[in-house]
């Protein structure tokens, strides 16, 4: 089972069940996974799901919320041979009008009630209803990419109006939801791992939340280790390059004027550098007659580098200066 399917299975068992929350959830299910029909003034509707737990959750909402017993059909998905489509049908009935009234999906004209299949603010006035709406919306048209690969939560909307309504609900929880047009649909999405964790918390997918947090921790540790290794590698390369440069300069000095012509303090460190090519600056410093720290050793080696540079310019005969520290 994918991460997204697992999260949906969990949320399906935790739908908020107060009267107002049921209406918000049913409205989302019908809007994003359903169709409403009208024939001879009588309404009927159905909703289809690929997830059995989601279909069962919607079935129970209709039963508990409106005392309606729905018909259920199960068919093999023609697009995905291994999957089934679960369709929950509420047959034509005069009672269905009352349901649509409570969901704010109809409006009255002088002659009759006509379908107004758009989401209304009245459905999500309370914070609990907003949560129920997000639960049902996620179950109907949401998906989460495998967090091992990337952090991405999205909702596939048919209209810009629906996308903006969902975006507004998400922003009421301080989510930075964005909208992008994809072919003929509108996608509302979150890309930050922390925001997806917060969203899972709001809709009650706590097991999925913990799994995602564990993945985030492992990925962060892995990234930290990689950064540390890269940093250590860069420092090691820098140290090796500096050591090779020092050795090359000392050998050049030996061939030109001879190491013996260097001041005693530079002569001592030069010989140690040649003899212990793999030693660190700290180790070289500890081998001196009068031990020095890394900065002191580095200072003397820089002086040697400068002498070699002057000699390479040519025409300048190096004169042995007086000993200095």
Swiss-Prot record:
InterPro entries referenced in this protein's UniProt entry, alphabetically: Homing_endonucl, Sporu_reg_WhiA_N_dom, Sporulation_regulator_WhiA, Sporulation_regulator_WhiA_C, WhiA_LAGLIDADG_dom
Pfam family membership, one: WhiA_N
SUPFAM superfamilies hit by this protein: Homing endonucleases
Residues of the DNA-binding region: 280-313
One of the protein's GO biological processes: regulation of sporulation
Keywords: Cell cycle, Cell division, DNA-binding
Cell cycle keyword on record: yes
Gene Ontology terms, MF aspect: DNA binding
Described purpose of this protein according to its UniProt entry: Involved in cell division and chromosome segregation.
HAMAP family the record matches: HTH_type_WhiA (MF_01420)
Family: Belongs to the WhiA family.
Designated name of the protein: Probable cell division protein WhiA
Protein's organism: Caldicellulosiruptor saccharolyticus (strain ATCC 43494 / DSM 8903 / Tp8T 6331)
């Amino acid at each position: 089972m994918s991460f997204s399917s697992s999260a949906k299975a969990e949320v399906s068992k935790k739908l908020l069940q107060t009267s107002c929350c049921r209406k918000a959830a049913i409205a989302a299910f019908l809007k994003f996974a359903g169709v409403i029909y009208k024939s001879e003034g009588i309404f009927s509707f159905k909703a289809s799901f690929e997830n059995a737990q989601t279909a069962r959750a919607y079935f129970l909402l209709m039963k508990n919320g409106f005392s309606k017993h729905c018909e259920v059909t199960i068919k093999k998905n023609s697009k995905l041979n291994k999957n089934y489509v679960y369709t929950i049908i509420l047959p034509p009935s005069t009672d269905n009008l009352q349901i649509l009234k409570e969901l704010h999906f109809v409006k009255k004209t002088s002659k009759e009630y006509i379908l107004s299949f758009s989401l209304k603010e009245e459905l999500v006035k309370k914070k609990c209803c907003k949560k129920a709406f997000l639960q049902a919306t996620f179950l109907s048209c949401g998906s989460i990419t495998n967090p091992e690969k990337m952090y991405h939560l999205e909702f596939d909307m048919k209209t810009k109006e629906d996308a903006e309504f969902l975006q507004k609900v998400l922003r009421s929880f301080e989510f930075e939801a964005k909208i992008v047009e994809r072919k003929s649909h509108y996608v509302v999405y979150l890309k930050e791992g922390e925001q997806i964790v917060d969203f899972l918390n709001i809709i009650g997918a706590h097991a999925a939340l913990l799994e995602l947090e564990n993945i985030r921790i492992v990925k962060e540790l892995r990234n930290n280790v990689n950064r540390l290794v890269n940093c250590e590698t860069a420092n090691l390369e820098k140290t090796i390059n500096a050591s090779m440069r020092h050795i090359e300069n000392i050998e050049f000095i030996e061939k030109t004027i001879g190491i013996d012509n260097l001041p005693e303090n530079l002569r001592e460190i030069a010989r140690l550098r040649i003899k212990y090519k793999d030693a660190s600056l700290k180790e070289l410093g500890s081998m001196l007659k009068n031990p020095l720290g890394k900065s002191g050793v580095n200072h003397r080696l820089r002086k040697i580098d400068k002498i070699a540079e002057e000699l390479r310019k040519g025409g300048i005969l190096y004169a042995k200066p007086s000993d200095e520290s």
